[in-house]
Regions:
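Helix-start/capping segments and mature chain N-termini
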Residues: 3-85, 92-96, 121-183
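Non-catalytic accessory segments adjacent to catalytic cores
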Residues: 99-103
Length: 183
């Protein structure tokens, strides 16, 4: 497993994500996967002003799309992001992506982030960007390893207290603990 030496996650065919094909819904337009570009001086990258969801597709059915989209918008609201699309527009775009790319079992990653219009902690003048990417991902855990039992680790890192971060948002910065626990 390329995530961690003791990981039991199934490796989907390992094509680097920047080399994949298909379409990404990017600020209201379908863009070729490899043609999507975000500037390296993006507020979302430097200050973790990005919120996201992770949604599974099982047998061409999207698992709880409306609930995930509602939570995505709730997270964006907590992060003071005025999303330029409605929940309905996002849901329609997601369904169209799944249908057009013929994903049977996969993963949907909608995300919202602040752009590169200004740098610094203050971000009032940044554009709010929105994208939806999907890809094939048949199973999260290797079925054979799953039968034997899945190993879990307890991170030495703890989630920040509720009064120190937007704990009830699915914000990128809150996931550094998950990343660190895999290293």
């Amino acid at each position: 497993c390329y995530y961690h030496r003791n990981c039991s996650v199934t490796l989907m065919e390992h094509i680097p994500f920047d080399k994949r094909s298909g379409k990404i819904w990017f600020n209201g337009e379908l863009v070729e996967w490899q043609d999507t570009k975000v500037h390296v001086i993006s507020h979302g990258m430097h200050y973790a002003s990005l919120v996201f969801e992770g949604i599974r597709i099982y047998n061409k059915k999207i698992f709880k799309l409306e609930e995930h989209t509602k939570r995505l918008f709730h997270s964006a609201n907590i992060m003071d992001m005025n999303v330029p699309y409605s929940e309905d527009e996002m849901n329609i775009a997601t369904r169209e992506l799944v249908e057009n790319q013929n994903i049977v079992n996969g993963y949907i990653r909608p995300f919202i982030w602040r752009g590169s219009e200004m740098m610094g902690v203050s971000a009032q003048k940044t554009k709010i960007n929105v994208a939806i990417a999907i890809w094939d991902w048949p199973a999260y855990f290797d079925p054979e390893l799953k039968k034997k039992g899945i190993k879990l680790n307890i991170s030495r890192w703890q989630r920040p207290p509720q009064n120190s971060s937007p704990w009830n948002s699915k914000a990128a910065g809150l996931y550094m603990i998950c990343t660190l626990s895999k290293h």
